[in-house]
Amino acid sequence: MATGRAHRPATRSRGIPEATVARLPLYLRALTALSERSVPTVSSEELAAAAGVNSAKLRKDFSYLGSYGTRGVGYDVEYLVYQISRELGLTQDWPVVIVGIGNLGAALANYGGFASRGFRVAALIDADPGMAGKPVAGIPVQHTDELEKIIQDDGVSIGVIATPAGAAQQVCDRLVAAGVTSILNFAPTVLNVPEGVDVRKVDLSIELQILAFHEQRKAGEEAAADGAAPPVAARKQQRSTGSADQGPDGDVPAVMPA
């Protein structure tokens, strides 16, 4: 099987927007689930619902791939799986190195979804000499001194950084110098890379903060709604007491002449 060095996905040269590229894995996941259930075709509405997007956006995205489906029939599931996999570069082997084998790095190493999507964990690397040689997910951990040699020997172009923030930039620099051109960064820091190197950042704490913002907003909306709509019993009491205090025109209390 060819390695990652032999190919670059054609999405940039074909002018596919980055937003569309970001949604292709969502479509592929939904299509793979349909394929596993032996579903032969799917409508744009059904696939859009499964992927969590609207059908108009899905049809626009697929137009960049040259796939328009068949009126009254829908999309061929198996063909779309192949087409999207090819566009994402998943029809071949992509060797990956994971640097930083702490709790997060070990969890990534044990993730079973990499191999089925075309990513082979070529090496696990850590700066702790005590980790060297210890197996994680059946792969022996290697010391960072071996980083450059591993990248060159295995033809690695994708690196995953799961180190503490303070070590991430130095690891990034070494990866890039050794020939890595795509980095998935789990370290809570921003990496500086030269032009031509792609970085995707995954910060779980930021995602949780965004969720906290939405939770706070929902709580505020609920509190505002509760304050704007008094209970039914309170409204009835207001009406009954108010009628005794109002004058004949309903605006001021009635005053009897002396």
Curated annotation (Swiss-Prot):
Localization, UniProt? Cytoplasm
Region (Disordered) spans which residues? Answer: 219-258
Composition bias type Low complexity, residue spans: 225-234
KW Ligase (keyword) present: no
Query: What are the record keywords, sorted?
Result: Cytoplasm, DNA-binding, NAD, Repressor, Transcription, Transcription regulation
Gene Ontology CC annotations of this record: cytoplasm
Q: Output the InterPro entries linked to this UniProt entry.
A: CoA-bd, NAD(P)-bd_dom_sf, Rex_DNA-bd_C_dom, Tscrpt_rep_Rex, WH-like_DNA-bd_sf, WH_DNA-bd_sf
Write out the GO MF terms. DNA binding; DNA-binding transcription factor activity; identical protein binding
Pfam families, alphabetically?
A: CoA_binding (PF02629), Put_DNA-bind_N (PF06971)
Q: Which residues bind NAD(+)?
A: 100-105
Q: Which residues bind DNA?
A: 26-65
> Could you state one GO biological process linked to this protein?
negative regulation of DNA-templated transcription
Subunit record text:
Homodimer.
The text of the family note is: Belongs to the transcriptional regulatory Rex family.
Protein role: Modulates transcription of respiratory genes in response to changes in cellular NADH/NAD(+) redox state. Binds to the DNA sequence motif 5'-TGTGAACGCGTTCACA-3' in the promoter of the cydABCD operon. May play a general role as a sensor of cellular redox balance.
Q: Which NCBIfam families match?
A: PRK05472.1-3 (NF003989), PRK05472.2-1 (NF003992), PRK05472.2-2 (NF003993), PRK05472.2-3 (NF003994), PRK05472.2-4 (NF003995), PRK05472.2-5 (NF003996)
Q: Which HAMAP family match?
A: Rex
Protein's name according to its UniProt entry = Redox-sensing transcriptional repressor Rex
**Species annotation:** Streptomyces coelicolor (strain ATCC BAA-471 / A3(2) / M145)
